[in-house]
Amino acid sequence: MTAGMGHSFRRNMKWALGPLPSARYWLGVEAPAWAQVVAGSEEIVGGLLGEEGGAAGAIVFTTKGVVALGPEGEVSTQFSYRDMGRMGTLSKDSGAPCEVPVTLSDGRLVVLRVGPPIGVRFAVATYLLLAWDVWRGRS
């Protein structure tokens, strides 16, 4: 991963998440061991820690897609960037982000906000901006 990619990822995460502490999200080179297990053979681009700071409720971004984890650290939802890219194109046509609600296995709701493609090599920076809409038990 290039330094520019890391900068774009952090900038996009800050834009999407607002004023959260930087420790809440990390780049691939800082990925915890459990994130590599989730990603398998895919390269990790970055991620967002769950409520307790570990695998529970976290989201891992790889070069091929997004993996959302449930309360026990199990995989609850997966998206490919190809699917997210289609939604990003719809977003470009409408001028507003597409919002994709994802319900984790413990009932918490995460809203993935997909913006239009911006011409960056990696799909994370190109298609996906993540926002925690409902994270602390609200639905």
Q: Predicted segments — roles?
A:
Residues 18-20, 31, 70, 96, ...:
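Intrinsic-disorder/low-complexity coil detector
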Residues 6-8, 118-139:
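Terminal and domain-flanking low-complexity segments
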